[in-house]
Each structure stands twice: as structure tokens, then as C-alpha cells.
């Protein structure tokens, strides 16, 4: 059994109502509940945290180093394009992570095309709406099974 951590960046608490044509109508609570259930069905635990504050996400990443977390799933949202702090925290704890996006940043505004995390991620899944999270979790579960 592995302990997994799912982090959501700024404004993702508004999922379901914020720009549904871009992000869909599924709420963050619905996404989290489905992923917790799937992780448990695979014999793993999943903790979920959303924050609009960069330092809260950084501190939770630091805590993951000590709490037995085996893998981090992260939708950094707008921090994707701005946060050296998240990059440094993820590199500092040395845990594998998957970068997730609901939309495909490469089909959007040019400032969204660069990620400070992608080149260090075990994988990047984007463009599938709420299914991006499910696909990311399935990839993590498969990797954990392969590596065990």
C-alpha cells in the first residue's frame, strides 16, 4: 500500500462554475472523492489539498518527505507558469510527481505554454478535463505496481 498526495493550485476550488467551457462542470469535491475511492480500491491512500497560497503547497510538499508519501500528483494551475518555489520544493523532497492540467495549456494563450515543472515530472497529463486526474492516478497506480 502506498500513500499518495494530490495537490491542487489556485482557483481550482472554483471548478464547476469557473469558465466551464474551459474547465468543465465537475467540482473539485467530485474529483477528489472519485480519486480517493479509486486509490482505496487499488489498496492505496490518497490525501487531497487545494490552496490558493503558494507557500501552503510548498509546506505540504515538504511534509510529504516525512509522512511516507510515495508519489505526488499536482495540478499547479496558474503556478505552473510562475512558481520556481514549487519546482524547488518538488526537487528538494525527491519524490516522483505527475503534473496534471484540465485543459491543454499548449492550445491556450502563449504565456501558458511554459511549465516550471514539466521537465522534472515523471509524466504530464493534460487536456482531458476532469479525466486528466483519473488518467494521472491510473498511471501512478500502474507505475507503483510495476516497481513493486
From Swiss-Prot:
Gene Ontology molecular function, alphabetical: 3-dehydroquinate dehydratase activity
Spell out the residues of the site Transition state stabilizer: 18
Residues holding substrate: 75, 81, 88, 102-103, 112
Q: Can you cite a GO biological process for this protein?
A: aromatic amino acid family biosynthetic process
Q: Which residues does the Swiss-Prot or TrEMBL record annotate as the active site?
A: 23, 101
EC numbers, comma separated:
4.2.1.10
Q: What SUPFAM superfamilies does the annotation carry?
A: Type II 3-dehydroquinate dehydratase
Query: Which catalysed reactions does the entry list for this protein?
Result: 3-dehydroquinate = 3-dehydroshikimate + H2O
Supply the Pfam families for this chain. DHquinase_II
Biological pathway:
Metabolic intermediate biosynthesis; chorismate biosynthesis; chorismate from D-erythrose 4-phosphate and phosphoenolpyruvate: step 3/7
How is this protein organized at the quaternary level? Homododecamer.
Q: Which family does it belong to?
A: Belongs to the type-II 3-dehydroquinase family.
The protein depicted here goes by the name 3-dehydroquinate dehydratase
- Taxonomic source organism: Xanthomonas campestris pv. campestris (strain ATCC 33913 / DSM 3586 / NCPPB 528 / LMG 568 / P 25)
Provide the gene name from the record: aroQ
